[in-house]
Amino acid sequence: LGLPEVPRMAGCITWYHSTPFSPSATGRLVVDGQNRGPVINTLVISNISKEYAPAGQNLISTTTDLSATESDVRRHLSILWGTSTHDWQLIAKYEIPAALPIQGIGRALTQNVKVSDQLYVVGDHRTVPSQQGALFSGRLAAELILNEGR
């Protein structure tokens, strides 16, 4: 069919900790620009909506690579949030072995979504690996189809 090759995938773990005290008053995503540990990003998700957290608690969402251990995650979170994580409770952990396509060095940020006259391929593997990338590639395909009068 002449389809584009399937990209290699990267995995991740999403960790959810509850805590009685919020380490931040914002809903901003925190990343470590110094690359000191396994945490890719973290945020106080209950600062976006209190309903996400157990009653009377705050909910921290954290994404790591697949090799992370809970002790490494807690150590890194303590650095990023500037507080002890000793009283944080792990309430869920989700391992996602094929979470995102690997972008790769030298790969164009946007791949053509039209692969033949009647075939369009969309997904975050065609643009930036993210939910936004998946939506963007779908929009590109929809616009192409509408502009072609199909």
List PLM regions with ranges.
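Mid-domain catalytic core of redox enzymes
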Residues: 1-80
